[in-house]
Amino acid sequence: MIDIEKLKAQHQEELKDAEMYEAMADEHPEWKRVLHDIAHDERQHADMIKHMIEHHNH
């Protein structure tokens, strides 16, 4: 059985991580591209989790 509350918490965690990497990119221009790539991946993970939650609710 899928633990929806755990997935929701993971979704929020991925979004927080993405924001953290984006903030780091602003502070470290030399790593900007890499950090934005990581943030993008975190947002993709969050989107996948969101789809799992939505699919489970239907």
Protein language model regions, located:
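Non-heme di-metal
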Residues: M1-H58
